[in-house]
């Protein structure tokens, strides 16, 4: 009898390691793909050779530079010039400066792009609003941005987080829900932008329409991009053997500032965050360029200056959805111990078209003899966020594994976006907002504790609207 009781306790404990107290939301959204917006939904702006698809990214390592990008139909004199100045009050005459962009175009199958202009502006003042203009004669268009505050450990800053956006009616809802939040200052975007490759011959016009679609946000706020599988555009059967060609031509970044040799992996420092961007679809095995770069970059992180260490990589390492299940496993096995040793705070991914937040877990103790092959709680591990739920044409990934595994804290098969409000070196507030009834409902939230300065276990503070 005593032996039976012992066996019963053992079985119960074994089950407890697999079945989680996490939440699988019962909110139901149709699995049908959202309607894609047509090419005509976002027409080119009026005016001769008017600039379009305007967007900005950080142009250096620490936030005193910006890359302003735009597209024009023709490469006319002056079309590569950007004029910019500090916003001033009253009758003060602004001191205007000019920058000159590099200009290129590309061909893809039967498509020829417009002229792609990328102007790098350096020496900006921190935490300052700038006005900028692109275009010539009667086609000048004006925008603005605010440079980030100077890097420091207690600098508050708010990031939006959007992934796998595409250009459907649901995508539009996601983007404008984020834009309605006055706190958002920059966007972390872990891949899959236009979904042009879901159309015949990777219809490059969808890259143009996507650029026009996101311009109302991307021309005013810095986007930090990771490349996803829908950016690969590798189609040798139609004469396109060069991976990432449209993405690299259209979306420049300051990768050289972080000593990277590729725009597909790089890092920046912004306010109190050190952000590392990795490429799921570039070689990352031992001694490859990405491996060597990441090893060196993690050594450079100074948590006394940038306490919040955030990584973006498109394919998730912890995912309990049957869609793309364990696709990120080889990269996890390669780098997870580095992330734990470096006390990474957050890892942001897309790829899976639903939402999930993990517990702080790791699976780094496994070897072929000890059988420790399941993730366990680890206070030094990051929280993994899967946010491939922007609204793209492929629809919702609504097939979660059952039972919910112990590493999964909250999961929901619906569209939305997230917001990360960094308060200081110890605390940041994270919320995920589902698209529901035309409102960005806050469905999941948690107060994050910094792994370097305050490595205390977080208490669940959300999941009240499941």
Curated annotation (Swiss-Prot):
Residues that bind Fe cation, according to the entry? 164, 192, 195, 353
Annotated Zn(2+) binding lies at 192, 229, 314, 351
Task: Please tell me whether the keyword Calcium is annotated for this protein.
Answer: no
> Where in the body, by tissue, does this protein show up?
Specifically expressed in flowers.
User: Keyword Zinc-finger: yes or no?
Assistant: no
GO CC, alphabetical: extracellular region
Tell me where on the tree of life, at the top rank, the source sits: Eukaryota
Signal peptide residue numbers: 1-21
Q: Where in the cell is it found?
A: Secreted
Annotated cofactor note: Binds 1 Fe cation per subunit. Binds 1 zinc ion per subunit.
Q: Which biological process terms from the Gene Ontology are attached to this UniProt entry?
A: phosphate-containing compound metabolic process
Catalytic positions are 324
Q: Which cofactor does it need?
A: Fe cation; Zn(2+)
Under the heading Gene3D superfamilies, the entry gives: 3.60.21.10, Purple acid phosphatase-like, N-terminal (2.60.40.380)
The catalytic activity of this protein is classed by the Enzyme Commission as 3.1.3.2
Q: Record's InterPro entries? A: Calcineurin-like_PHP_ApaH, Metallo-depent_PP-like, MPP_PAP, PPA-like, Purple_acid_Pase-like_N, Purple_acid_Pase_N, Purple_acid_PPase_C_dom
Record: glycosylation sites: 172, 367, 424
Q: Where does substrate bind?
A: 229, 351-353
Under the heading Pfam families, the entry gives: Metallophos, Metallophos_C, Pur_ac_phosph_N
The record's comment on protein family reads: Belongs to the metallophosphoesterase superfamily. Purple acid phosphatase family.
Please give the subunit comment from the record. Answer: Homodimer.
What name does the UniProt record give this protein?
Answer: Purple acid phosphatase 25
From the broadest rank down, the organism's phylogenetic lineage runs: Eukaryota, Viridiplantae, Streptophyta, Embryophyta, Tracheophyta
Whichever gene encodes this chain, its name is PAP25
